[in-house]
């Protein structure tokens, strides 16, 4: 489990390092006012970038348990840990929903 946490941190660093460059190439590629050869060149540069530099490569993991399943994006916690924190009144403003 510790290996997955280290791997995820490494992927985050790679993503933030190449994020601006990837956005620049993508904006050039999607700009329809530019000639096609410039847009194709930008597409080639994006393909040359490492696939681990994209946001899709990063796995969402729980902040507390490092669990990779059922992680809620708003809290960055798995549903199990979030349920425990809510039941112990550690999270303000969140209540159990009853019909």
UniProtKB/Swiss-Prot annotation:
Keyword Ribosomal protein tagged: yes
Coiled coil: none
GO BP of this protein: translation
Main location per the UniProt record: mitochondrion
Protein name: Small ribosomal subunit protein uS14m
Listed InterPro entries: Ribosomal_uS14, Ribosomal_uS14_CS
Transmembrane segments: none
Species of provenance: Acanthamoeba castellanii
Family the entry assigns: Belongs to the universal ribosomal protein uS14 family.
Localization annotation: Mitochondrion
GO molecular function, a single term: structural constituent of ribosome
Lineage of the species this protein comes from: Eukaryota, Amoebozoa, Discosea, Longamoebia, Centramoebida
UniProt keyword terms in alphabetical order: Mitochondrion, Ribonucleoprotein, Ribosomal protein
Any one annotated GO CC term: mitochondrion
A Pfam family this chain is assigned to: Ribosomal_S14
């Amino acid at each position: 489990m510790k290996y997955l946490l280290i791997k995820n941190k490494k992927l985050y660093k790679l993503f933030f390092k190449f994020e601006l460059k990837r956005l620049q190439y993508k904006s050039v590629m999607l700009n329809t006012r530019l000639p096609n050869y410039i847009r194709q060149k930008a597409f080639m540069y994006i393909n040359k970038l490492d696939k681990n530099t994209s946001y899709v490569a990063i796995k969402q993991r729980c902040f507390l348990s490092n669990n990779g399943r059922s992680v809620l994006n708003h809290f960055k916690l798995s549903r199990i840990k979030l349920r425990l924190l809510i039941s112990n009144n550690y999270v303000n403003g969140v209540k159990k929903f009853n019909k």
